[in-house]
């Protein structure tokens, strides 16, 4: 599955300068001591994915993680079994921590120490709800920062998300001021959202972090 997915991605970007990422998410099992999956088993599962896709990838993205222990296993597997840049993102709750209780500061310090090439948040919340979380990450790492927020929450009747493309881009101004380097979107976003963000960034280039 991984090899075929990477092959299709390569075919889709042929003739362009678009980069292809080997995207890795959670395994779907909790690691010990919260769950039953051993750290070594998680490492081997991530290694299998990396070995299958690294030859066709320009970088590795590890995202939507809630457990610092699991993202540690994934990052170590990536760093020890490839020479590709590795971007690492976790997803946070409204209380400012991940589902398993990891703080933005702990995430930033740990992942930089393990050799990540960029850190950030994806999925999680709307842009306006991620301000303090990303700000805290920025205070604890010198790595490039990434944001891929949700477009708010979907309406249970219409299934439309609460943050429009225009508002999404406007809310991203905060992160440009903060010096976030890489921008994207998660649940509820579409190419229209990315176009609006790009237009905003042309007018408001990300500030250089000190």
Locations of the language-model features?
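Domain-level signal for soluble alpha/beta catalytic cores
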Residues: 1-210
